UniProtKB/Swiss-Prot annotation:
The keyword Cell membrane does not apply. The keyword Cell inner membrane does not apply. This is Meso-2,3-butanediol dehydrogenase. NAD(+) binds at residues 15, 17, 36, 60-61, 87, 151, 155, 184, 186. The gene is budC. (R)-acetoin binds at residues 138, 140, 151. Belongs to the short-chain dehydrogenases/reductases (SDR) family. InterPro entries: NAD(P)-bd_dom_sf, Sc_DH/Rdtase_CS, SDR_fam.
């Protein structure tokens, strides 16, 4: 198995893509550390995985003190960290005028600070194992969206941080890449009105949203030795959404 006895830390593991990634890495032999602010949800996911092969951590990734403590405790308890999956994220809709300073602080705290803090404090351990980082960015980090200014800014930061960290640490054997999903079927998006989901599906060449497991498969690929020469890549997992130049479909 590709991750036999490797230690994989996954943030935002209580649902959606993070939960799917936890199940994928676990199925491929990893010991998974599931980090999430939602204690009940992350405990439930951990309890559903093989006994002794999953550890749940209740954490706010925007708290750098808590993040440093978590990474050090994981490395001390499990002996190593091989993979960090920075998946925790939040979204607040609206333009810069429509959203508040608190909205920005919330998005920046989780979507940017969380990635920076987790990477910073995992890297000393990843350097020892020649491990890797996979960030969850977004197609919203590759181009702009209407009514999602802060989210686009945050995910754009993750995209370029991925490139910069790949340059800084690739020479030391640590690869850093990201996945850039479009619409994914999650607890949040499944509750959207059908007409909104239909608009997304019209922009996706495959005509549908991604299953969380489809994104998790790409995360696992990027973290595996199968991707040993991929570094600094931001991979769209979008059903062809970014293949378009933005002009309308008229045929």
């Amino acid at each position: 198995m590709r991750f036999d006895n490797k230690v994989v830390v996954i943030t935002g593991a209580g649902n959606g893509m993070g939960e799917a990634a936890a199940r994928r890495f676990s199925a491929e032999g990893a010991i998974v550390v599931l980090a999430d602010w939602a204690k009940e949800a992350v405990d439930k996911v951990a309890a559903s995985l093989p006994k002794g092969r999953a550890m749940a951590v209740h954490i706010d990734v925007s708290d750098h003190v808590a993040v440093e403590k978590m990474m050090n405790e994981v490395a001390e308890k499990l002996g190593r960290i091989d993979v960090l999956l920075n998946n925790a994220g939040v979204h607040v809709a609206g333009s810069v005028l429509e959203t508040s300073i608190d909205d920005w602080r919330r998005i920046a705290g989780v979507d940017i600070d969380g990635v920076v803090f987790c990477s910073k404090f995992a890297l000393p351990h990843l350097l020892k194992t020649k491990g890797c980082i996979v960030n969850t960015a977004s197609v919203s980090g590759l181009g702009g969206d209407w009514g999602a200014a802060y989210y686009c800014a945050a995910k754009g930061a993750v995209v370029n941080l991925t490139r910069a960290m790949a340059l800084d640490h690739g020479g030391d054997g640590v690869r850093i890449n990201s996945v850039c999903p479009s619409l994914v079927k999650t607890n949040m998006t499944n509750g959207w009105p059908q007409e909104i989901r239909d608009k997304f599906n019209e922009r996706i060449a495959l005509g549908r949203a991604a299953e969380p497991e489809e994104v998790a498969a790409v995360m696992a690929f990027l973290a595996s030795d199968d991707a040993s020469f991929i570094n600094g890549a931001n991979i769209p997992v979008d059903g062809g959404a970014t293949a378009s130049d933005g002009q309308p479909k008229i045929v």
